[in-house]
Amino acid sequence: MKIGYKELHIPANADGSPKIDINSLHIWPRGNFMLMGLANLDNSFTCTLFMPIEGENSFESLKSEEQLISFFATYFPDTKEALPDLVRDFFRNPNSYLAIMKCFPWTFNDKVALIGDSSHAIVPFYGHGMNAGFEDITILNEMMQKYGDDWDQIFKAYEISRKPNADAIAELSRRNFEEMSAKTADTNFLLQKKIEKWFSDKHPEKWMPLYSRVTFSLQPYSEALAIGDFQNEIMQEVLKMDNIEDNWNSEEVENKILELLK
């Protein structure tokens, strides 16, 4: 991904209260770039500007104070009061870069095995980089219990098991950036998520939303990705239904999803 990021800061008010809602994840989606705000314990916010490195609307294009102020006035006008130190933070804080790294094999004979980011660095938009590394350790330990001192077999079984899941969480993380930066401003996408939540609440045994499946279950990432793609195909059919905007929580929609799940 040719995307970088830079951290900015929203301080608390003089009386210690937050400038924006403290109980929300704040996202300003703008297509191929976005601003995100996460609350801190002191009622301040750490904001992150994710943006292409080069091209129009990129870090490369914001070289002067005037360009920066004009850019924020155009795309994030409601942050003017919240970011009093925008210019200082932007030009003082470093640009960092996002990367997805895939490789194989992860092992060399019975001597060395790569684990975690050394074998599958991913972008942070699912928050699962560390969890994926812990899963590596879990599977490696299982193979050690299964194959004893046969490290060649341990390593082979470990990398074969983990590679598809590492690739899957890399893809899920990449897609989540696209969802946050662009689709959260799309009315059809928001309607889809509303229908999924409604149907899942009614039929939790039949439908777990993709994000919940990845984050709150022990299901392998590769299975979660495949099921999520299947669910998305169903939802694209549901969104084609007549008057879906008004009838999104109707019995007709419920029956349609149940039929497509068969």
What is each stretch, according to the model?
Residues 8, 94-185:
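Conserved mid-domain beta->alpha element of the FAD-binding
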Residues 20, 67, 117, 122, ...:
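Conserved short hydrophobic patches within well-ordered secondary structure
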Residues 1-98, 102-108:
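Conserved FAD-binding catalytic core of PHBH/FMO-like flavoproteins
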